[in-house]
Structures are given as C-alpha cells and as structure tokens.
Amino acid sequence: MALKVRVITPDRTVLDDSVEEVILPSSSGQIGILSGHAPLLTALESGVIRVRTSGWENIAITDGFAEVEANEVKVLVNTAAKGQDIDLEEARKAFESAKAQLDQVNAADRKAILDARKELKRTRARYMAAGGMA
C-alpha cells in the first residue's frame, strides 16, 4: 500500500506523490513513516525530508509541521526545495558562509547567536539535500 506525501509551502506544493517511505526531521529526532503508520502530528525542524520511491529523493525544509493520518503525510513548512533543484556549489558556499558568520557572532548577543544558528541549520539542510556532506 502506498503512502501519499504532500510537501506544501505558503506559495507552492513542492511534492505531491505516492511513496514507499518518508523520513521527517522532527523536533525530537528523525521519524520514519511507512504505510499503516499510526496518526501523528509533529513539529519539524530545518533539515532534510527523505522520500523513497524507486530511489531516495531529498527535500530541504525549514521549520513547520507534519500530520500523518490514513496513509497520508501532509507537511506544511515555511520553505522547501528538492535537492535536485539546488545548486550544490552555491549551497556549499552558503553553508560555509553561515559557519563563518556563527564563528564571528558576539557571544554576549543571544539573539544574534540564535539567528546565526538558524541560518546555519537552513544552509546545512540545503547543502545536504543537494548531495553535500555525504
């Protein structure tokens, strides 16, 4: 039995397909979802969603939520991009820049630290989805 997965951002649907398995980056760790999974509502963190059909596909996301019910997974996130649509070299440069920016943040500026960490997670997800950091 197939699992219907939809990844939706405020401005578009990134994925709407039947898959065999999906792995979500939840706030409590990665969650693997197969057909017949119990109903679930979970918060998602910036990371990579992995979906398996005949092979694996990566989707970089930022924070959001996922609902699993009746063999359907609805993922609502702020942004999402398929790994195949992300330029690997551009993603690598953005990730390196975010790492450097975090290293330069004033340790006393908590907001700046949080913002830099959030940007690092976002750029890391895009880099990983594009095939970097294997």
Swiss-Prot record:
GO terms for cellular component: plasma membrane-derived thylakoid membrane; proton-transporting ATP synthase complex
Membrane topology: Peripheral membrane protein
Keywords (A to Z) from UniProt: ATP synthesis, CF(1), Hydrogen ion transport, Ion transport, Membrane, Thylakoid, Transport
Single Gene Ontology MF annotation: proton-transporting ATP synthase activity, rotational mechanism
Main location: membrane
Entry-linked Gene3D superfamilies: F0F1 ATP synthase delta/epsilon subunit, N-terminal (2.60.15.10), Helix hairpin bin (1.10.287.540)
Job of this protein: Produces ATP from ADP in the presence of a proton gradient across the membrane.
Quaternary structure, from the entry: F-type ATPases have 2 components, CF(1) - the catalytic core - and CF(0) - the membrane proton channel. CF(1) has five subunits: alpha(3), beta(3), gamma(1), delta(1), epsilon(1). CF(0) has three main subunits: a, b and c.
Name the UniProt record assigns to this protein: ATP synthase epsilon chain
Gene: atpC
